[in-house]
Amino acid sequence: SGETEDDFRTTGGELCAIDEEGMSARATQAQEELTYAGYYSTSMFPPVELLYVTGTENDALASALQSMWSTTLGVNVMLRGVTQSEYNARMEAGNYELALQKVTALYDDAMGFLDRWCSEDEQNLISYENGTYDVLMGVARASEDPVARTAFLHDAETMLLGETALSPVYFDGTAHMLRDTLRGVYTDGFGNSYFAGVRANTD
C-alpha cells in the first residue's frame, strides 16, 4: 500500500485459514453455527447446490469442497457444472445457492478487488447491496490520506466477509528459487516475479 512497511494483506491479517490449526478452528466454528441455527443433526440440513463453470480446475475444486463439507460438516452438496453463459445468466438472476467465482483485479491495489462489490457496480454478479459498504468504498476512493484510505478499505473488507457475501477459498500463486548469492527479484501484488533486477549479493 506504500504508507507502511507492510502491504494491505499483511496489515489486515489473513482472510482465511492457511494452516491445519486454523482450518480445524474454522470447522469447529462452522459446526457450532449450524447447531446455533437449529441444525442439531446434519440430516436436518437440506442439500445445497454448488454452481460453477465446468473446467479442469473448477471441477477439481468443486469436488474437493463437496468432499470437505460432507466429511467435516455432514452437509450434502450437489455439484452443478455449467457453461460460462449459463453461469452468468444464473448469477445475474440470483438463481444459485453457492457459486464458485474467480476474482481478479486489473491493477495492484485492494480497491481493484473490493470496488466490484458496490451495489451499482456491473461486476457485482452476486448482487451484494449494503449502503454502509458503498459509503466506506466511496470515502476510501476520495481519500487523499493513504493511511485513512487503507483503514476504510479494511473496514469495507471486514463488512463484506462478515456478512458472508463471499468467502475466499484459495489464492493463485507462483514460486521460484533463488541462490543465496543473488538478490533483486521483484514480486508484484499479483504474484508475478520479475528477474530483470537480479544481481550478485555483495552484502
Q: Would you name each region that the model predicts?
A:
Residues 1-10, 56-67, 88-203:
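Detector for C-terminal structural segments
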Residues 1-36, 57-59:
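Structural transition elements
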Residues 27, 84-85, 154:
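Structural motif corresponding to alpha-helix initiation and N-cap regions
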Residues 35-44:
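Surface-exposed acidic, glycine-flexible loop patches that form ligand/cofactor-binding
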Residues 43-45, 74, 164:
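Short secondary-structure junction motifs
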Residues 45-54, 77-80:
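Short, well-ordered beta-strand elements
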Residues 65-79:
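Short alpha-helix C-terminal cap/hinge motif
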Residues 78, 82, 100-101:
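Short beta-strand and adjacent tight-turn residues that come in two discontinuous sequence segments
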